[in-house]
Amino acid sequence: MELNNKYMKKMLSGMLCLVVAMNVPGVKAQEYTDTIVVDTVVMDTVVTSWSDRVIEKLTMLVQEADRSYYNTGISVYDLTGDSLVFAYNQQKMMRPASTQKLLTAISALDVLGAAHNYRTAVYADGTISPNEKGVQTLNGDLYVIGDFDPKLTVSHLKEIAKAVKAAGIGQINGKIYADLSMKDTLALGNGWCWDDEQPYLTPLSLSGKDYECTPEKIHRHNPSRNFLQALSRQLEAEKISVNGIGTATYRPTGKSTLICTIVHSVEDVLMQMMKDSDNLYAESMFFQLGAEGKKGASWKDCAQVVESVIEKTGFPTAYVKVADGCGLSLYDYVTASLHVALLRYAYQHEEIFTPLWKTLPIAGIDGTLEKRMTSGAARNNVRAKTGTVTGVSALTGYVRASNGNLLAFSIINNGNRTASEARAYQDRVCEVLAE
């Protein structure tokens, strides 16, 4: 009895309170409180259950966090048993870094669906007739309607050029224009630092460094112009003469001919967005949400859609601030309990969970977790989104416990001097959950 009393005092030291864990029938029923949640402890028996072992080890880890200089929030939920396992500072609002992409991904899968397509369309505006040399000529302009597809490459430009040729066009008397009306004109995200490595946000650009424009100057802050220059060269390669490229504008609303459409699905984009934590891909997904059914979407339009999905989980939106889709913003704030609420919501909806599961980095195997948790029970088990910016590190996702139950978890560290020390702490938590 004395031994068990000592154990109880040690476990409760530094904690806010002790409550009995109970089954929670639905997302809305969960109380988002800053407590350490444990199963009932029988005083006259030796602690041997999985939950007791996990709680004991996590309690020691959060005592360690209490003594550290940085802030930590943790939430762990048993999806199989439908009960809260452990929580520490789970309602403390913290910066999420790239775990913000989890909000964007789940919102996109819920609102748009995995099969929703980005559609980059090419239109010929004007009549097509032979010129004096008998060459079929477009007496007008060519318009490329941007849809913020981040996967466009030079190979797609070649497809467009071949489609123009197949339409019987051998010469374009007008110019090539980009229609960028699907989003606002802001090139950077809301709350981004000027010295961050930022993607340039435009509805029409080529993926990465895929420009093929060695002879010409690259317009670093005008990706749409780079796109049109590269397309012009592909048209010339197909023996189609062009009268030049124009500035960004709107496609005329009059009669025009659809030449071709390049499509990529939400699921296609999610893979690189989540595995590699690609910020441009995340922002493109964010604006797909805001642009659905309207033109000129702003970050506020996108944030409202994400917040509407959060409301579906029953989580109070007062504890979240959505400012962008990738987590670079200084204005993004979440809680560990929000992450877990969204992971639970995804788990309860197969059309969200199945594609999300495929895209999450796997510990010791791929993506941003390839070099983390390379041995032990967490390897090839933890599937989670990482997050790192200066002073912020986070990890949130799923792990299979040794008792066979699937857990949803979130670990957020703010104020850490280095990412490595926070990651090491997160990995230790994951080992406890997996072993």
What function would you assign to each model-found segment?
Residues 1-35:
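Bacterial Sec-dependent N-terminal signal peptides
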Residues 30-80, 84-93, 162-166, 435:
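Beta-lactamase-like hydrolase cores
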Residues 69-71, 89-91, 99-100, 115-117, ...:
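Extracytoplasmic
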Residues 71, 133-202, 238-240, 247, ...:
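Mid-domain, small-residue-enriched loop/turn segments at the edges of structured enzyme/sensor domains
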Residues 82, 96-114, 176, 230-235, ...:
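Active-site SXXK
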Residues 85-87, 290-435:
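Small-residue-rich helix-loop
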Residues 143, 159, 181-214, 218-229, ...:
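A conserved catalytic-loop motif detector
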Residues 211-357:
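A small/polar active-site loop signature that marks catalytic segments
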